[in-house]
Amino acid sequence: MLVTPLLLVTLLCALCSAVLYDSSSYVYYYQSAFRPPSGWHLQGGAYAVVNISSEFNNAGSSSGCTVGIIHGGRVVNASSIAMTAPSSGMAWSSSQFCTAHCNFSDTTVFVTHCYKHGGCPLTGMLQQNLIRVSAMKNGQLFYNLTVSVAKYPTFRSFQCVNNLTSVYLNGDLVYTSNETIDVTSAGVYFKAGGPITYKVMREVKALAYFVNGTAQDVILCDGSPRGLLACQYNTGNFSDGFYPFTNSSLVKQKFIVYRENSVNTTCTLHNFIFHNETGANPNPSGVQNIQTYQTKTAQSGYYNFNFSFLSSFVYKESNFMYGSYHPSCKFRLETINNGLWFNSLSVSIAYGPLQGGCKQSVFKGRATCCYAYSYGGPSLCKGVYSGELDHNFECGLLVYVTKSGGSRIQTATEPPVITQNNYNNITLNTCVDYNIYGRTGQGFITNVTDSAVSYNYLADAGLAILDTSGSIDIFVVQGEYGLNYYKVNPCEDVNQQFVVSGGKLVGILTSRNETGSQLLENQFYIKITNGTRRFRRSITENVANCPYVSYGKFCIKPDGSIATIVPKQLEQFVAPLFNVTENVLIPNSFNLTVTDEYIQTRMDKVQINCLQYVCGSSLDCRKLFQQYGPVCDNILSVVNSVGQKEDMELLNFYSSTKPAGFNTPVLSNVSTGEFNISLLLTNPSSRRKRSLIEDLLFTSVESVGLPTNDAYKNCTAGPLGFFKDLACAREYNGLLVLPPIITAEMQALYTSSLVASMAFGGITAAGAIPFATQLQARINHLGITQSLLLKNQEKIAASFNKAIGHMQEGFRSTSLALQQIQDVVSKQSAILTETMASLNKNFGAISSVIQEIYQQFDAIQANAQVDRLITGRLSSLSVLASAKQAEYIRVSQQRELATQKINECVKSQSIRYSFCGNGRHVLTIPQNAPNGIVFIHFSYTPDSFVNVTAIVGFCVKPANASQYAIVPANGRGIFIQVNGSYYITARDMYMPRAITAGDVVTLTSCQANYVSVNKTVITTFVDNDDFDFNDELSKWWNDTKHELPDFDKFNYTVPILDIDSEIDRIQGVIQGLNDSLIDLEKLSILKTYIKWPWYVWLAIAFATIIFILILGWVFFMTGCCGCCCGCFGIMPLMSKCGKKSSYYTTFDNDVVTEQYRPKKSV
C-alpha cells in the first residue's frame, strides 16, 4: 500500500465522533448514516490543520474563573477549530475549567457547569455532577443538553465544524443543525489544568479507506504528492511503477515585464476660458435673483482656468459687507492654476452689487467662495440685504467658485508629464500568469542565462523569441550586469510521473530540470522524503539486480535512493578501445579494408500524460472522459511495458556480450605421435657452446659487436683459442676489426710480446707489431660500432615519428567518424525533443479549443464536439503506442544482430563472407556510440582476380558399375579447370590443389531432381484481375471527410550518416603504418668467459675437503655408517661398523652394554 494505515484511530459511527489523525495534523468527520462498501472512497469531511497556538490561563490573577459566563474568545474565521486539553483532562470546577464555546455567526454553542444560586445567568443553577451543553441565537437559548459527569469525567476537547454546524465534546457529537456556517470565533475560559491547544483548520477533500463501514485510513487531497497521486487515481494502494499525474491545484502568481524601465506620460490638460459678458443686465433685488454666466464644471483630471480678461478689472478686498468673501478658499483667481487639488470644482461669473453681493451669495449657498472685481460700472444694482433691497449700488463682477476637497481634480498651467518607474520582478520556478512585453499567457519561467549568453541571442535589440504557435519561448531583460535570458515552459509537464517503489511514493520523474533534480537516462528525478521534495544525492551504489522499480540502468529503492544496475558478470568488464596486439599476415593478392557499421541497441523512451493530452485543463472534458473507462491505462500500459522490456533486454544484451576469459592451454607432457606440431609451439632456446657448469665456473661479459663477431667466436673456439686472437681478425668494409674485449690470457700474451720487443732495441722491435695491430683493430671495431648505433637510432626515431603520425591521423579519422555518428544520433534526439516540446505547447492549444467549444455551444452539443476530439486524440495516442511497439521490435532485432556481431566478429573470426565487413574477416573492434555500438571491421578484399572455369561436379561412369556423381564437400571450395587439369580451390581465395577423397561427396545418381511449385500451393500469388482496387477502396472510403487538427508543422531534415571519407583516411593510415618498417644495420652480441684466479680454486678445494670430513663425522656419531663403510674405506671404523647398529642400542665408552627393547609394530 502507498499509505501507512493509522491503526490507532477508528471512527466508530456516523455523526458521533471526531478524532485527530497523523500526529494531530488533520481531523476527519464522516457525516452520513449510509456507510460505503469496503475500499477507498473520495469523501468530504476532512479538515487540515493550518495554525496551532496554546494558552495556559485566561482567568487572570483571580483564584478561579467565573462559571456560567462566556469569556476568552478569539477570532478564527475558519472551517473548523479544535480546542484540546492535556490527556489527563480538566476538572469541572471554577479552579480549572468554566466554559468552552464556538460562534457560528449569530449562533453560539457552549458547554459549562454552574452550581450557585443566582450566579448562573446563562443556564441557571444545575444539580451537582451535571454539565450543560446549550445553543443560543441573538441571546435567546433554543437548545439544551444536560449530561452527567459520569459520561464525561473531565473536559478533554471541544471541536466545532462548519459542516451542519457540528459540535463535538470529547470527540462525541453534542450539537448539529441543517446549516453550514464557518466558525467566526471560539475559546475556552479556564484557570488551571492547561494548556489549551487551539488547532485552526481548513476543509479539504479526502480519500478514505473503509472496512465494514469504518474509516481506517484517510489521505487528504491537499496538493501534496501523496494527495495528488491518491486522489487522482482514487486509490491508496499502488504497486511499484510510474504513475503520470496532473497538478490542477497550481498556485498562480502574476508579473509584468516592461519594455522600458520608466515611462513618461503626458496628461491631457482641459482649458476653461472665461470672458466679460457685454450684454449683462443689472440684477434685481435679492441675492437669489443674481444671474450667473459661463458656468464651467470640472469632472476629473487636469484643468486650467483662464481669467485673462480680469486684467482690466480691479480686485476688491473683503471689507465687512463690501467686496470679496472667500474664507474657505486660500487662493486668488490669479493663483488657482498653481497645482491645487479638488474633489469637485465649478466656476461661474455674475454681475451684482459690490455691497454685500459676495458675502450674501456665500451665506445663501450659491457658492463656496466669491471674488469681487470693479470695472467702474453704473450704480444700478439692487441691494441684497432686507433693508437695502430698493437701494442702488455700484455694479461689479462676481466670480463664484463651488468646490470640495479631494484629489480627483488638479489645476495646472501646462500639460503635466508623469514618470512611471517600472520594476521587473520576475517570478521563477513556479506557474504564473505573465504579461511579457504586452503578450499575456501562463507558464513556468526558468533562468537560462548561463546556457544562452554565449550565443548572443537577441543581441540586436530583440526582446523575445516566439515559437511556431506565436507564444513567447525565450525573452530577454536588461539586468544590472547585462542581459538576462528566461525561458517560458508549460506549467504542467506532460511527462511528469510519480515513482512508487516498495509500495511507497519515493520520487517524481519529470522532463524539467528543476533545482535538486538528478538526471536518470533522459528524465530528471526528484526524491520525495516525508511528502516533500529533497535535494539530490549522488549515485554511489551498484546492485546486481533490482527487485523494485527500475528506469533504464537505474534502480529506485523504497527509500528513494538510486543505485546502478550492474550484473555480476559485468562488474569487472573493461573494453579496450584500440589496444590491438595481434600480428596479421596479408596475402599479396588482397588488400586490407576497414568498414564501419553502426547498430542501434537502445531506444529513447517516451512518457505521455494521457489525460492531460486528451483534455488539457478542461474540467468538463475530464468529466466526459470518465465514460471511456480505462482506455488511458491500456495505452500507458503498452508504452510502459515497452520501456520495461527495453530495459530488461538491454541488460541481458550487455550481460550476454561480455567477453569471457580464455584459459591458456598447457601442452606439457603431451604426445602427438607422428604429427609434428613444433612449429605451433614456442621454440626452445638453442644450447650455447658453453655448458651450465661453464656458466657457473666462469664469469661472462657481453658486448655489442659487428656481424663479424660470430666468425671470430667460431675461429677462437677451443682450449688455446686466445693464441689465435690476431689470426682470427676479420675485415668490415675494408677495415681490420677485433672485438674490444681482452681476457687475462690475451693481456698477458700481448704484454709479454711488447716487453720482449723492447729488450734489445731495434733487433727485437718487430715483436711489437702484434700488439699494435690488435690495438688498431679493436679501435676500428669501437668506431664502426658507434657509427652503426647512431644510424640505427636515427632510423628508429624517423620511423617511430612516421608511425606516430599515421596513428594520430588514424585516431583523428576514427574520432571524426564517431563524431558524425554522435551528430546524427543527437539530431535525431533533438527532433524527438522538439516534438515533445511542441506537444507541450499544443496542450495549451487543446485546452483553449475545448474551452471555446463549451463557450459557444450548449452542454449537449459541446459534449458531442468534445467527444469527437477525445476519440481523435485517443486514436493519436494509440498510433503512438503502436509506433513505440514497432520501434521496440526493430531495436530488439538490432540487438540480436549486435549480439551475433559481437560473438562472431569480436570474440572470434567469422567464416561468413562479408558478414563482418566487406570480404573475408580478420579483426573487429567495437566502440560505444550514442544509443548503439559502432563496429570497425578489418577485412581483406580481393585486389586481382583470376578467370577460371568452374565445374559444379563430376559424373563418374565406371565400366562395370552404375554411374555416380561427386561434388565438392561443404566448405571445401569448388572444382576448377586449369590447363586441361581439374583442381579444387577455396571459393574466396585462389589456391588450386589436387582433389582428394576428403574434398568430395558422392551422389547416387548424376540426375538432378526438380520440384515444381503449383500456383494453387502458394495462395499469396494474385493475378491483376483478381479484384478492383478502386472499387474496393470506394466501399470503405466513400465521401468520408477526415480532418485532423492543425498543430505545429514539423519540417525536419533527417541527417544521413556518411563517413566514407574518414574510412578512406583510415585505410591510408594503415598503408602508412605498413610502410613504417625499420631496416636496421645488423649488430651482434659477443659473450666472453673469463677464468677465475688460482686462489679462488684453492679456496674451493679447501671447502670440499672440510665438507667431506664433517659428513664422515656425522655418519660416525649417529651410527648410520653401515651403508657407507664400503664407500669411504675408513679402516679404523671397520670394527665398529661390523656390529649391528640399532636404534635401541646405548653406547658408553664405545660399547659397554647392549640393551634390547621389544620392537613396536609400525
From Swiss-Prot:
Documented effect of changing residue 1012 to I: In strain: Isolate Vero cell-adapted p36 and Isolate Vero cell-adapted p65
Outcome recorded upon mutating residue 692 to V: In strain: Isolate Vero cell-adapted p36 and Isolate Vero cell-adapted p65
Coiled-coil spans in chain: 822-866, 1055-1083
Naturally occurring in which organism (per UniProt): Avian infectious bronchitis virus (strain Beaudette) (IBV)
Gene3D superfamilies: 1.20.5.300
Protein's name in the database: Spike glycoprotein
Gene assigned in the entry: S
Quaternary data: Homotrimer; each monomer consists of a S1 and a S2 subunit. The resulting peplomers protrude from the virus surface as spikes.
Annotated stretches, region: Heptad repeat 2 (HR2): 1024-1105
Intervals of motif Di-lysine motif: 1159-1162
